[in-house]
């Protein structure tokens, strides 16, 4: 089930954010994610976030900022079970177009977004990490 993020969800959602980023981005030092943990928690409280619950446990979430996808995050043990797709489809139902940034070294995420209809528009550089990324977009047809 997908529902709107509630304030009480913050610890579980922030933990999923941290764990997922460390595992998915092994080319970025874990300390980078840990050092941003507190500010991300604060930002999540103000953001448009939808959580996916299974058996009353939050297993994933998606963050939106207008048409920008801040991220799709699924807890490690629940990955590759369609939860990311469900969350992304939920966002697609709410927007006519979406865009996001994804690290070029994150081949798994790039493949996922391509399967879901996103296209690479151009490449750039994440100045905070020094890593190259892609801007990908999706548009309702």
Language-model features: locations:
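Conserved acetyl-CoA-binding loop of GNAT-fold acetyltransferases
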Residues: 114-123
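Conserved acetyl-CoA-binding loop-helix of GNAT-fold acetyltransferases
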Residues: 80-93, 111, 115
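A short beta-loop-alpha structural element at the N-terminal edge
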Residues: 1-15
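Conserved GNAT-fold acetyl-CoA-binding loop/helix
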Residues: 15-41
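Conserved GNAT acetyl-CoA-binding A-motif
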Residues: 93-105
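A short helix-loop-beta-strand connector motif used in the catalytic cores of GNAT acetyltransferases and
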Residues: 39-51, 68
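A short, internal acetyl-CoA/4′-phosphopantetheine-binding micro-motif in the GNAT/acyltransferase core
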Residues: 68-79, 102-103
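Conserved beta-hairpin
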Residues: 48-60
